[in-house]
C-alpha cells in the first residue's frame, strides 16, 4: 500500500509540475478562434425551448489563454441559455462566468439554447444577443447569437366536444394531438397552418371539415422548423407527426385545398 501511495504521489507531482509549467499569455495578439462568428438558430416558436446548439472555442497560440469573463451582453432579457466549458451562465449571477482557462492547443465547448418570450407580432421577429469573451489581456471577443421568434397559438392537446372552428394568421402549434368527439364538428378554415408535435395527430370520431381556398391552402405539418441535414429540412421528411385518422363513427368529412405533408399517416 505504501508503494502504491508513493507511486500515486509521484504521478500527482508530475501532473502538478506540468500544470505549473504552463504559461498564460497577456499578449493582445493571442486570441481565441471560434467555430463561428455568428451562431444562427432556426426559426422557433415563442415560449417553446429550442434544441441545443453548440460551437468550439480554440486556443491555437503557443501559450495558455485565460478568459477573465464570459457573459451575455443582455443578461436574461432575450431568453438565451449558455453553458461554457461546463459552466452555466446563471441568470442569478448576471449571466456570466469568470476565470476560464484554455490551455495551448486546447479548446472548450459552448452550448446554447433559447426560449424566447412572446413578442406580440404576427410575423417572426429577430432575437439576438452577443456572447462576450474578455481575455486576461483586455481584448474582448464576441460571438453573435441570433434566431427568429414566432408567436403562436399553443395547444398541449385539444379535445373538440362541440362544434369548433380554427383559423388564424398566427401558426397553431399542437403538442399532443386533436380529438374530435363523435357528436362534434371541427372546421378548419384558411388562413391556418397547424404544426404538430411528433406524437400528435388528429383523431376524428365526429366530423372534420377543412376549407382552404385557391392560393391559400390549409397547411398541416410537423413542428420541426430546423434541418435534418443542411440540404434537407425536417418539413420534407415523413414521419414527423401522426397524420389524420378517421374512425368508424366519423362521416361527412370534407377536405378542400389541404396541404398535408411530413406525416406518418393521412
Which role fits each region the language model picked out?
Residues 57-61:
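Asparagine-centered strand-capping/turn motif at beta-strand->loop junctions
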Residues 3, 63-64, 252:
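Short, composition-biased linear "edge" segments at structural boundaries
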Residues 71-96:
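Short, solvent-exposed loop/linker segments at beta-strand-coil boundaries, enriched for Pro/Gly
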Residues 2-9:
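Sec-dependent signal peptide recognition
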Amino acid at each position: 500500500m505504501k508503494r502504491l501511495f508513493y507511486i500515486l504521489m509521484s504521478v500527482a507531482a508530475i501532473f502538478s509540475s506540468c500544470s505549473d509549467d504552463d504559461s498564460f499569455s497577456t499578449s493582445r495578439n493571442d486570441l481565441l478562434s471560434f467555430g463561428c462568428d455568428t451562431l444562427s438558430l432556426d426559426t422557433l416558436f415563442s415560449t417553446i425551448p429550442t434544441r441545443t446548439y453548440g460551437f468550439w472555442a480554440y486556443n491555437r497560440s503557443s501559450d495558455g489563454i485565460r478568459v477573465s469573463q464570459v457573459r451575455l451582453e443582455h443578461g436574461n432579457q432575450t431568453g438565451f441559455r449558455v453553458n461554457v466549458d461546463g459552466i452555466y451562465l446563471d441568470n442569478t449571477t448576471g449571466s456570466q462566468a469568470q476565470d476560464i482557462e484554455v490551455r495551448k492547443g486546447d479548446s472548450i465547448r459552448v452550448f446554447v439554447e433559447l426560449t424566447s418570450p412572446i413578442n406580440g407580432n404576427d410575423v417572426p421577429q429577430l432575437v439576438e444577443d452577443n456572447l462576450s469573451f474578455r481575455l486576461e489581456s483586455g481584448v474582448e471577443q464576441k460571438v453573435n447569437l441570433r434566431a427568429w421568434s414566432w408567436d403562436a397559438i399553443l395547444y398541449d392537446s385539444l379535445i373538440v366536444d362541440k362544434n369548433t372552428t380554427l383559423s388564424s394568421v398566427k401558426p397553431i402549434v399542437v403538442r399532443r394531438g386533436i380529438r374530435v368527439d363523435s357528436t362534434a364538428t371541427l372546421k378548419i378554415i384558411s388562413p391556418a397552418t397547424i404544426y404538430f408535435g411528433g406524437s400528435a395527430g388528429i383523431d376524428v370520431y365526429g366530423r372534420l371539415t377543412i376549407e382552404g381556398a385557391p392560393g391559400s391552402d390549409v397547411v398541416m405539418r410537423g413542428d420541426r422548423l430546423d434541418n435534418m441535414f443542411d440540404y434537407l429540412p425536417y418539413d420534407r421528411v415523413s414521419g414527423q407527426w401522426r397524420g389524420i385518422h378517421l374512425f368508424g363513427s366519423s362521416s361527412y368529412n370534407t377536405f378542400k385545398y389541404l396541404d398535408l405533408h411530413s406525416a406518418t399517416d393521412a
